[in-house]
Amino acid sequence: MSVTANVLWVLRAAKKSGFTVSADSISKGVQYVEKCAMPDGRFRYRYWGLQAEPSLGGLGIIALANQGKLDHPLIPAARERIAYQYRRLTIDDLKKQRYAVYGCFYASLAMYVSGDDYWVPFYKKAVQMLAEMQRKDGEFADEADNTIYPTAMALMVLQAPLGYLPIYER
């Protein structure tokens, strides 16, 4: 699902830049994301998979919202699930989630496009989580001790309110 969602993101950017983008390609990508969705707001990595990861919720929202489908029926459950988790879980619980920084990045995009009622409480908790995850040298690491990708994702989340990146747009 992450590959499909990111391809949809690139196709949207290409279309906005004036490139010709096949409506069929977008439709097939959206259909795949829809197949990965579960009724409770979670998304599976593959539509035939059993396990749904919390980190994929934001990605599912962005995949649908990037196609101008902010009113898509799958978005409210996914958005509420992310908001609920960030309200309910402690900072330590959030840090222990599988793919915590990755999930935080995609959740940040989803919460940002959802408006301040979702964005502000999410961002406050995300900043606390990321502050505790940051190493003394400034890096962020994932479960496999990779640092480049998680550091880049964490920094994008932290700078979001500054409005420098077009990926954070409403």
Report residues per predicted region.
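An alpha-helical repeat/solenoid feature that recognizes helix-turn-helix modules
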Residues: 1-27, 35-125, 139-169
